[in-house]
Curated annotation (Swiss-Prot):
Its EC number is 1.14.13.9. Catalyzes the hydroxylation of L-kynurenine (L-Kyn) to form 3-hydroxy-L-kynurenine (L-3OHKyn). Required for synthesis of quinolinic acid. Gene3D superfamilies: FAD/NAD(P)-binding domain. Its cofactor is FAD. It is an enzyme of class 1 (oxidoreductase). This is Kynurenine 3-monooxygenase. Belongs to the aromatic-ring hydroxylase family. KMO subfamily. SUPFAM superfamilies: FAD/NAD(P)-binding domain. Keywords: FAD, Flavoprotein, Monooxygenase, NADP, Oxidoreductase, Pyridine nucleotide biosynthesis. It holds the Pfam family FAD_binding_3. One of its GO terms (molecular function) is kynurenine 3-monooxygenase activity. Pathway: Cofactor biosynthesis; NAD(+) biosynthesis; quinolinate from L-kynurenine: step 1/3. The gene is kmo.
Amino acid sequence: MNRRRERVVVVGAGLAGSLAALYLARQGHEVDIFERRPDPRSALAGPEGRSINLGLSARGMRALDGVGLLADVLKHSVPMRDRVVHSPDGGVRAQPYGVREHEILHSVLREELISLVVSAAEAEPGVRFHFDSLLTSLDRETGTVRVAPTAGGEASTVTADLVVGADGVFSTVRQQMQHGLRANYAQDFLPWGYKELTIPVGTDGQPRVRLEALHVWPGHEALMVAHPNRDGSLTCTLFMAHEGPVSFAALDTPAAVRDFFRRRFPDAEELMPDLVREITEHPVGHLVTVRTAPWRYADRVVLIGDAAHAVYPFYGQGMNSAFEDCVVLDECLTAHPDRAAALAAYEAARKPHTDVLADLSTANFEDLRDRVHRLGYSASAAADRLLARLLPQRWVPLYAMVAHTTIPYADALARANRQDRILRRAGAGLTLAVGLAATAAALRVGRRRRAARR
């Protein structure tokens, strides 16, 4: 595809679609992006109840760096160095995200990130954004799309060499591309939903809790996480069942809201002066996983991001994996002059790993809900980190591989499983060795501190 200038249509100007457009434009192609929503940089655009904070990690950072955007994005982010776990009894415990200084996450506002990516893509020659434009049909054989203004009016037709479906979990491109094919499709809704809440800046202008961390309030029937913002506030996401005794439906009066938070998240309730209003007014979002195949048709159509592999948000990899799609698609289009071969290589390179990511995201939901506050979980994580410090070339915790490297997801899980088998076989002997190593490390630190005071 890199041999001549071609016309590409991208359907969806979200994060994945806009970044894909930028990569394709850098290959020298003419790119039209059609998006049913308004320009995200305009006052009319809204988050539609979706999470407005995102956790940027290594895969997403690599993708942004590939088009020269990383430094600018990091200026608009807040580093998250730890996961701070809040217990119902008011206790707080920090769990480091990694063992090395650079192993941190970055919290960024969705609206700021998408504005940066859209503006960068729009600045490229041959790139045109068409907002408030709804895809009504796709001819997968010819690459012809028909698009109508959302406000009504005459539809237009565009024929492209390649159509990129970046139109989200309920993708119209996917539906029309797979129509009549022997296609697999599975959609799994979690019985839980989510609602966005806020911990505002304190009356003194200072953050009400430690800012450079992801805060987690775990619980079997409800859990909450909070991402930091540059203004000192935090954006909270409350996860719980849609229906039932402990659910969003049950939070139907101010008294019910306050009683629920005082029992479940007592230290958070006092930090949220607008809690009742936000619970009442903010919409409940849905959580869904999508697995599908194929991701492409011949040399004409390809899917990226949620259109190909939506996952639950509990590993913080939805945006990062979508950005990684853009990198791999770019690499495949460069490596294979035959576009059909390039699209096949892209799907083969990505799908096995995004399937594993879906499983990891579900498992991490269970960890955040049930296990992250337990001492056994903390001890296991601490042992994992210690082994990584002692054996940096041989031992890497699963979370570190997923969040802080670009090791493909399935390869990361396979390596983590091998490490787990080693621990199980070694049993008490290795546990003792790790304990002795930890003691020795603590003694070394103590000696250094005493020497520094002399």
